[in-house]
């Protein structure tokens, strides 16, 4: 039956894998009396599925992770409550004016910012893995929503803007929620820091440029502030003479905000024992400025409400804010509306992800806890799915409010509930006060909030010192945002960063290694280290890196060996080896036309020139795979092609192929599948590394001899080279002498186990592989000399 199966598989071109029994038998013959045999089992597809698919326990953990508050809520205590009360009240005082300001930025009425703020803090704590994050309206997302509304409002005049914004929140929330459910939060890691910094800086400059007209009161001068940032700046400067009394409110409030911040910061350093007091004073500066200028506005405009025959206010005010949740409703999901903003969805989703995950990870590291990015995506998704039922628009994590919450001493995510209560009070009790808030003051609040998101020059210089290319990506991203739009800037920076990543993988340069013997400064420890022959790693160029053996090459991969870089790697290997070695057998062509067109050999065969070539012939190649985490079908096929190419170069000799430092069983399986695990030398002596697992005596283990393995000598067996080296340890000799004097008729032996499988040319490190290759080559050389001597005697 087996013969028929083999014949059928042979017709299909499938080579039946080697039986496990055969491999184990060969392993036993290799191990001999030195060590117990060990043959590495290949991983199976079943094992892969078992590793990837969750078991019952993992599924239970997955379900529990969906509601992280269950892990800590039963331990909630009074001390935590006090910290959460302080932080929640502090953030609540800040989020009310910020929420209304960001709603203005989105082109919506102020109450929608309050709705978004309320839903964000109330919902988030159920799903939070960060105690510091505050979800709500943010400047960048509000700007993006404003751009979308400006584009869609003329097309759908019958649909209110807040319903379009709510529809956008539902769609983006559903996308992010699904990403969280399938646990792909790691995808955010593909967006590097320079791209995030460029996005934040460019967006901040765009927002500031768009708010300056409101700050100065010349927004109604007839120019559009939603175009490219550079055009907004130019138009603002042109209409600067048209500024009005709003500028007095806006500029002075902005100046006061920065003055209070600098004063509180200085006082905290000057009087460190009162640092906490100055922190809260600094945190509440926005609230103080809003209240102060609202009082001024009320004093000036209390009889200028623009209703009941009263004159218009002297400067622009928010106006009437409805009390309560007047816009609660089921979100309107219009297919035509969705079709019109679907092109903006990638940018909107990226904004939701970048700001929230970057902030949560940063504060997690600062406060010594770890967030779950995928669970944070679920939190964002649920918030934006529920929010539109209350009239909210897209929301995500806020940097400024998160920083305030962290510094205020928040203890748990429950602080969001405290903040939500304050927002609820504001929605129901303070709407009459909101009427007198100046729009110019709100513009000052926005400018002051987003100004901190601009990357400092010192940080840009740090980028330049670490990686000039990353610094250029940052600068380019900011310029693109200023001259086009936030969305295009996001796409370009992300795509450029991805292209740089792919280029670095595809054009990864390996290293040919040489040996240097080093020792510690006290001279007690000597070992071999392997450094690049060209010293590109920055090692001392005065050191002479030695080749391991004539015709033996050690090549280190610096990235995974995959389809993108396989040809680049192997081209480096082949080109270098052909330059460093000579062909074992020089082809002789009777006619010039017999020579291949791509063979640049001499026109005529010259034996003297061949004799003068002192380059060695190719003997062995050792690949250091310690940096390789993946191989694929393409890369393994390229490796087979290169093997055949170099085998022809060294023909009729055989080339040994060895692999060191393989860290993944699937890589070993792939190499074994293409027959790269064999030493390719029939005469090769089986060599493998072993490790001592302990010393035993015949009294403790009397079954060893019965099993036929026998005692292993107290001499150390160096299996790598087959050379017995005397163990010159005085302690062992003393113990043996004491045992003899005591008249014990027993012996002791050391037991060794192979580190890797004994039937494959895989080695733990480069040193082991080199020793195995050299031993085989020396063995071949001795046999050739003996054969030559025998031939000479016979003649």
What does each model-found stretch correspond to?
Residues 2-520, 524, 757, 778-779, ...:
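Transmembrane helical cores of multi-pass ion-transport proteins
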Residues 1-62, 512-795:
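Cytosolic C-terminal regulatory domains/tails of membrane transporters and channels
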């Amino acid at each position: 039956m087996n013969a028929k199966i083999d014949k059928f598989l042979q017709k299909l071109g499938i080579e039946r894998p080697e039986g496990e029994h055969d491999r184990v038998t060969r392993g036993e013959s290799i191990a001999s009396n030195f060590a117990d045999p060990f043959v590495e089992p290949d991983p199976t597809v079943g094992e892969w599925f078992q590793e990837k698919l969750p078991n019952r326990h993992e599924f239970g953990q997955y379900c529990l992770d969906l509601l992280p508050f269950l892990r800590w809520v039963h331990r909630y205590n009074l001390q935590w409550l006090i910290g959460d009360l302080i932080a929640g009240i502090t953030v609540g005082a800040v989020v009310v004016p910020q929420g209304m300001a960001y709603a203005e930025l989105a082109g919506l009425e102020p109450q929608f910012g309050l709705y978004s703020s309320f839903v964000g803090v109330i919902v988030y704590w159920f799903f939070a893995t960060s105690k510091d994050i505050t979800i709500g309206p943010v400047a960048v997302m509000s700007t993006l929503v404003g751009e979308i509304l400006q584009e869609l409002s003329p097309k759908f005049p019958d649909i209110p803007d807040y319903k379009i914004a709510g529809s956008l929140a539902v769609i983006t929330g559903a996308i992010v929620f699904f990403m969280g459910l399938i646990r792909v939060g790691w995808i955010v890691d593909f967006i590097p820091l320079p791209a995030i910094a460029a996005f934040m800086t460019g967006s901040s400059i765009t927002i500031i440029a768009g708010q300056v007209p409101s700050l100065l009161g010349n927004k109604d001068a007839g120019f559009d502030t939603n175009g490219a940032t550079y055009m907004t700046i130019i138009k603002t400067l042109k209409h600067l003479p048209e500024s009005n009394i709003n500028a007095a409110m806006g500029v002075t409030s902005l100046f006061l905000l920065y003055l209070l911040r600098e004063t509180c910061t200085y006082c905290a350093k000057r009087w460190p024992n009162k640092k906490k007091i100055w922190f809260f004073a600094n945190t509440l500066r926005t609230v103080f400025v809003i209240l102060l200028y609202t009082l001024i506005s009320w004093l000036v405009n209390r009889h200028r409400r623009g209703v009941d025959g009263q004159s218009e206010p002297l400067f622009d005010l928010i106006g009437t804010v409805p009390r309560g949740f007047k816009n609660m409703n089921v979100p309107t999901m219009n297919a035509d509306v969705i079709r019109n903003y679907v092109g903006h969805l990638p940018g909107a989703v990226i904004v939701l992800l970048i700001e929230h995950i970057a902030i949560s990870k940063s504060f997690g590291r600062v406060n010594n806890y770890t967030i779950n990015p995928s669970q944070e995506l679920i939190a964002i998704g649920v918030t934006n799915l529920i929010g539109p039922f209350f009239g909210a628009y897209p929301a995500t994590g806020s940097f400024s409010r998160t920083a305030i919450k962290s510094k205020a001493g928040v203890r748990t995510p429950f602080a969001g509930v405290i903040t939500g209560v304050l927002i609820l009070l504001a929605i129901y009790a303070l709407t009459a006060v909101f009427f007198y808030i100046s729009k110019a003051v709100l513009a000052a609040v926005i400018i002051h909030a987003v100004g901190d998101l601009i990357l400092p020059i010192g940080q840009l210089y740090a980028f330049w010192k670490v990686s000039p290319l990353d610094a250029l990506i940052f600068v380019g991203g900011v310029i693109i945002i200023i001259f086009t739009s936030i969305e295009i800037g996001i796409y370009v920076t992300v795509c450029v960063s991805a292209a740089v990543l792919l280029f670095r993988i595809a054009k990864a340069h390996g290293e040919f290694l040489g040996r240097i013997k080093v020792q510690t400064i006290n001279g007690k420890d000597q070992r071999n280290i392997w450094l690049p022959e060209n010293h590109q790693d920055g090692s001392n160029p005065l050191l002479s890196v030695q080749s391991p053996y004539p015709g033996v090459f050690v090549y280190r991969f610096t990235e995974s060996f995959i389809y993108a870089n396989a040809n680049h790697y192997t081209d480096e290997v082949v080109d270098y080896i052909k330059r460093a070695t000579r062909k074992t057998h020089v082809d002789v062509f009777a006619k010039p036309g017999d020579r291949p067109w791509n063979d640049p050999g001499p026109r005529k065969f010259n034996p003297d020139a061949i004799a003068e070539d002192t380059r060695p012939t190719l003997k062995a190649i050792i690949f250091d795979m310690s940096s390789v985490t993946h191989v694929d079908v393409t890369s393994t096929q390229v490796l087979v092609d290169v093997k055949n190419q170099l085998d022809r170069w060294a023909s009729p000799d055989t080339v040994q192929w060895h692999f060191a430092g393989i860290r993944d069983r699937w890589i070993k399986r792939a190499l074994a599948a293409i027959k790269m695990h064999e030493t390719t030398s029939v005469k090769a002596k089986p060599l493998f590394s072993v490790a001592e697992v302990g010393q035993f005596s015949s009294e403790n283990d009397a079954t060893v001899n019965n099993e036929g393995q026998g005692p292993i000598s107290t001499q150390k067996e160096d299996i790598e080279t087959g050379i017995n080296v005397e163990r010159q340890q005085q302690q062992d000799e003393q113990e043996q002498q004491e045992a003899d004097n005591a008249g014990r008729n027993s012996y002791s032996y050391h037991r060794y186990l192979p580190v890797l499988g004994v039937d494959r040319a895989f080695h733990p490190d480069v040193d082991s592989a080199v020793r195995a290759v050299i031993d085989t080559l020396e063995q071949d050389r001795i046999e050739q000399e003996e054969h030559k001597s025998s031939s000479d005697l016979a003649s």
